[in-house]
Amino acid sequence: MKRTLSFLLPAAAMLLAACGGANDRPSFPDFQEMADPAAAFADWSAAGDTPCASFVTTDRRFGKSQLPDVEPRTACRLTAWRGERVSAQLVLWSADSVGGVECRIAKFRSAGVLTSDEGRLPESAVRTRFVRYVMSDEFACGCCKRKPQDFAAVLTADMLDERPSMALEACTVRPVWITVDVPQDAAPGLYRTP
């Protein structure tokens, strides 16, 4: 019988910081996301003065210009088998622009091991990627015969971007997709990030 591993991701492990210094990720071409047709109807009056972050279900997408209606969650628990890939989603939002947002996760460490490399997951086991928005049409009735002019254009969260940092524009949302590839030889137990 396989034993499971559990992971705790505190939001404090995710860093909203000014971009600086070298990074070890390759350079990727950038593109300008299209304007959000829903931006004109967005109400950010309830947003606070500071950037916000919350872990959310991986089953939900967020409109780029819509203030998220979420219960703040500062931690996420994932349960996985050895050799399994599991994911989490963090959503960032701000009423003001924030330059150079980076998302980093500290090394996972087994709850019972504090000093040695034993009981740790390698840094390569965890990836963070910004979710980018692409233009689409509303899903409405699903996949059926339809006339394009009968369906509204929408900006939808779809693409995972490998870039190490990204600016968060004022009154926008930026999801972050977190992937954990559990090594085949990982010891069973509870792993945490500081």
Model-derived features: positions:
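Positively charged n-region of N-terminal signal peptides that target proteins for export
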Residues: 1-4
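Bacterial N-terminal signal peptides
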Residues: 6-17
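Mature N-terminal, pre-catalytic/accessory segment of carbohydrate-active enzymes
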Residues: 19-194
